């Protein structure tokens, strides 16, 4: 029996998505596209070719309407428009930070008349050598991590594969990142991309929505479509142990662990999921992760909380804990949000912590806070349906200016 089949699958109990009256083709696999084409009368002999044409128009050209798909007959385009859409999530607001970070509030189509539409946030972080898109996997979150703003919003539902891929497509739309003039991804070139990396670090726990996240990332990494290398896709989990091996085995992307503490007692408080999957089990799952090596290290994220987890004793325990794991440690200065109970560690303490880890042989970059002024930094995402009061917004601006 393999490790993938030995462990029970971990899923959220909440499954409240309702199918749309006119479903989107975004997020479907090629076999699923062929099945939908068969459902509207496309001959079996033509389905594979037509599905490939749709795949190209949706994921290479970024078509937003069937009318744009000129290599498909008018008759079939009319049939497609009658039964399906290629709609993305609706952009409700776009905020641009002083540092160039962009945050989009996206409204998802409601499943039925009268149902309240749900919203998620998606963030684009431009840097000199890359452009990283931070994507959400759930509306809200169930984990209740005490330092995370998203954790103050209850879990509403999982996103579909189409809604996850749709975030990438919205970002490419807004940034003008589609190679509209080329016929294949080989001609598009990696160097011309604005979105070079995707991180599953937005709202929600990706491994509590495993199947949809898997299906979405396989589409994003498909080399006949969006074509992002799996080495440029990182999935971050708080430690849903049964699905960690599956992530490497079935998706093959880079893994990041939201660690944040080196003792179970403290991690139980910061990341309550630790009560179910304690550090010993989590670290063993990391050692068993398929493909992990010095060339494909696992990233451990560690938020720096003043007087909580930032001592040199914590740094020593961290080095001991990661023995035998090909790892790098990302130190994250705590990003404040209204009502948070924590403060960011002093900068000199962060540097001492980083230096100790580096001298022990681990890469230990300190993440530069991005988008704090628009509540787009790590741990700050939350649907705008959970409205901030004017007082909270003023407090946020003050915190951003102070830091």
Swiss-Prot record:
Enzyme Commission numbers on file: 2.1.1.192
Catalyzed reaction equations: adenosine(2503) in 23S rRNA + 2 reduced [2Fe-2S]-[ferredoxin] + 2 S-adenosyl-L-methionine = 2-methyladenosine(2503) in 23S rRNA + 5'-deoxyadenosine + L-methionine + 2 oxidized [2Fe-2S]-[ferredoxin] + S-adenosyl-L-homocysteine; adenosine(37) in tRNA + 2 reduced [2Fe-2S]-[ferredoxin] + 2 S-adenosyl-L-methionine = 2-methyladenosine(37) in tRNA + 5'-deoxyadenosine + L-methionine + 2 oxidized [2Fe-2S]-[ferredoxin] + S-adenosyl-L-homocysteine
Superkingdom of the source species: Bacteria
Binding site for S-adenosyl-L-methionine: 204-205, 236, 258-260, 335
Binding site for [4Fe-4S] cluster: 141, 145, 148
Keyword terms, alphabetized: 4Fe-4S, Cytoplasm, Disulfide bond, Iron, Iron-sulfur, Metal-binding, Methyltransferase, rRNA processing, S-adenosyl-L-methionine, Transferase, tRNA processing
Residue pairs linked by disulfide bridges in the UniProt entry: 134-378
Single biological process term from Gene Ontology: tRNA methylation
Needed co-factor(s): [4Fe-4S] cluster
Catalytic residues (UniProt): 121 (proton acceptor), 378 (s-methylcysteine intermediate)
Regions crossing the membrane: none
Single GO molecular function: 4 iron, 4 sulfur cluster binding
Name this polypeptide is given: Dual-specificity RNA methyltransferase RlmN
Source organism of this protein record: Rhodopseudomonas palustris (strain BisA53)
Organism taxonomic ancestry: Bacteria, Pseudomonadati, Pseudomonadota, Alphaproteobacteria, Hyphomicrobiales
Gene name as annotated: rlmN
């Amino acid at each position: 029996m393999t490790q993938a089949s030995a462990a029970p699958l971990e899923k959220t109990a909440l499954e409240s998505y309702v199918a749309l009256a006119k479903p989107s083709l975004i997020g479907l696999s090629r076999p699923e596209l062929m099945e939908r084409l068969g459902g509207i009368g496309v001959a079996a002999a033509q389905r594979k070719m037509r599905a490939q044409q749709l795949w190209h128009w949706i994921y290479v050209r970024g078509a937003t309407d069937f009318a744009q798909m000129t290599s498909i007959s008018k008759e079939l385009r009319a049939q497609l428009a009658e039964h399906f859409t290629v709609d993305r999530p609706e952009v409700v607001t776009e905020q641009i930070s002083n540092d160039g970070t962009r945050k989009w509030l996206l409204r998802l189509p409601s499943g039925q008349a009268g149902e309240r539409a749900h919203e998620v946030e998606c963030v684009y972080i431009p840097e000199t050598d890359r452009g990283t898109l931070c994507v959400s996997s759930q509306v809200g979150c169930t984990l209740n991590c005490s330092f995370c703003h998203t954790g103050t919003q209850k879990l509403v539902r999982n996103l579909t594969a189409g809604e996850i891929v749709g975030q990438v497509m919205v970002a490419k739309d807004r940034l003008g990142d589609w190679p509209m003039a080329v016929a294949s991804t080989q001609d598009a070139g990696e160097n011309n991309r604005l979105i070079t990396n995707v991180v599953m670090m937005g709202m929600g726990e990706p491994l509590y929505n495993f199947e949809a996240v898997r299906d979405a990332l396989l589409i994003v990494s498909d080399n006949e479509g969006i074509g992002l290398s799996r080495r440029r896709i990182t999935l971050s989990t708080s430690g849903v142990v049964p699905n960690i091996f599956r992530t490497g085995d079935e998706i093959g992307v880079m893994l990041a662990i939201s660690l944040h503490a080196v003792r179970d007692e403290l991690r139980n408080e910061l990341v309550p999921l630790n009560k179910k999957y304690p550090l010993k089990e989590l670290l063993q799952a990391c050692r068993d992760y398929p493909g992990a090596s010095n060339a494909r290290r696992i990233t451990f994220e560690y938020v720096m909380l003043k007087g909580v987890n930032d001592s040199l004793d914590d740094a020593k325990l961290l080095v001991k804990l990661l023995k035998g794991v090909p790892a790098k440690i990302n130190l994250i200065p705590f990003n404040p949000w209204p009502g948070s109970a924590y403060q960011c560690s002093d900068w000199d303490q962060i540097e001492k912590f980083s230096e100790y880890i580096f001298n022990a042989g681990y890469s230990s970059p300190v993440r530069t806070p991005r988008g704090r002024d628009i509540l787009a930094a790590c741990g700050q995402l939350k649907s705008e349906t959970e409205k901030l009061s004017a007082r909270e917004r003023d407090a946020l601006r003050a915190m951003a200016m102070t830091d």
